[in-house]
């Protein structure tokens, strides 16, 4: 065995062994308990970042541990390979998205291998290949036939100069990111999947997810947003038209002072013909971003349409305003406004001098002061005619019943959740498999024409999708008729909604899933990824699973039993202010820092002499130039060190602060483990361990070894507190480093201890563990070795610590044999100097003894 720990030599050797032996390839085996460990698949951006490394290290630790428990462990990997960044990069690098993507996949694949992750590479998939997306296309056509897919017009961000649709992130300050033209809202036809048909099940089944974080479940509950309310119809004065609104607060109905409709509402559009101000306002609303978050923060504006609606219970004529905060695609495109009891309605009414009518009393039973804000709390009604004196629930029912009796109101359950718009007017995505025949009939692409293949050999102009720019691509023939293909592509959330299931049968050619394989592996036992995916991806992931279940492909209701959301990786961030007042961010590795005695940064500069502003730790990002390249760290310290630091520096679900001093500490620890194994093996083969021949010191050390095994097993397996597991191994190593290796049983015990340490470290640091296991002559490869078992008999304490009190006050602590009698404990206590002092010249009147824990002597 070589004396020095040289990770660069051993890691490549061990990785080659895994590749040649196909160590982590698995097949279905009914005789073994399965365990499916999955980390969210990466987007092939070009290089791994530390967030990836943390995510995949956590997954690999869990997978390797479960494998050592004897389970049949599936840990696959693939590439979420479609998406907008590839289009931008292709234009910038004068290439097409496909070669850019495949080059990145190859590069990142080598990076993943360099980190020693135990993936079943035979199952690798890339979502941009027709072999993958053909099944998604076929499934979509089946959903269409079931009535779960439909087309309707929906608002998008439109650049009138480039004549193209922009994603929300391509709209900068209301303008196109490319040509700076003012962006408009435009209604275009798009495809939708009816996720709302599953809203109740998606909501109710959250209760089955006992091992998902509560934060994620709460976010999904709020996103689905189930509410119970009343849909109310208003007649429009001097017209046959009607306006329908939905409210969850019918108790405030007598306080309605105006209605607000979307700029795109048919009534507003019609009224604009005779109202130029309204026409201008509708045109202005076309320049509003379509993201809901933007709607919430923008200035609320409106114009009176001149129309009046009739309050169904009071007969009062109420003004109808067009407002930019009402969206046509949300609900009915109209809302009732109660400015006395809704803050948004209040601000709008105040701005435009609309009436404000209070109808709910304060908690003290007085009329509310509405001079500064609305009273939004529920309470008892007043100013509401026959409904005065009713509380929220009674008023809700009474008003709902009265409206229903008049035929103008209906109780309804509503959802905040909207159907999933899956159309994207982009190139780099899976083509939507729909066609329009010459006679105008819209239908799914016939099965024998699937997949609809995206051409990869294209020229990107950065404006129009190549398949939209090429009229020939869309031309096809269906049922003997000329037809045009859909030129929109799928939202990339489509691919990431079912990849986990395809991993169970990636080579299967008869359909989307091989049901036998899928139902052997599914559901996923643990899914690991960032909490930023809580609503979009994780909701679509659950939805798709239910769609596949209802198509008879999977048996379970939910895709993953446990969800672990890893924390972000933070690093120091520094900048200096440039000549024009701009911030120039400097990489932490280029910062020269001074620290105080507590290690805090007090001053920083760079090589060019700029004085740097230290902003503290923040998420590693390109914008702050504070990312640390994992490859650089692996080349400097080895993959095992990087992995160990990642798992030790912080609990898995908390943020991790990148500190190179911590990485150095992890490296020193692995050198110590190597050194101890080297010293042990250089003494020759150890004899067999004879437990009965151990002296007290040896028994105590063996007790520590087995207590550590028990703790580490619990920390990794049940608690998933990996940092405390590593801390326990480090503590044991400190004891082993001081243990003698002279006697035969000393060496036998050391071998038992080191074999346990190396196996406990194996999930974290697999390369060095593999090598040291061989040096210790462990049986077979460590990859097939069982997890160490704690010996209960070794953990039994020979001695115990008893607290001695005199008249209830602690006067000493004594160590006695675990099986000592009360008499022996009293004798031993009397020998303690301090205890003896308090017993001198007094009589012991009473003795309270809690065996093995406490002796209280009552004296007088």
Curated annotation (Swiss-Prot):
Gene3D superfamilies: 2.20.28.290, 3.10.20.590, HUPs, Isoleucyl-tRNA Synthetase, Domain 1. Its EC number is 6.1.1.4. A motif ('KMSKS' region) lies at residues 619-623. It catalyses: tRNA(Leu) + L-leucine + ATP = L-leucyl-tRNA(Leu) + AMP + diphosphate. One of its GO terms (cellular component) is cytosol. Keywords: Aminoacyl-tRNA synthetase, ATP-binding, Cytoplasm, Ligase, Nucleotide-binding, Protein biosynthesis. Transmembrane segments: none annotated. GO terms for biological process: leucyl-tRNA aminoacylation. ATP binds at residue 622. It comes from the Bacteria. This is Leucine--tRNA ligase. It comes from Cronobacter sakazakii (strain ATCC BAA-894).
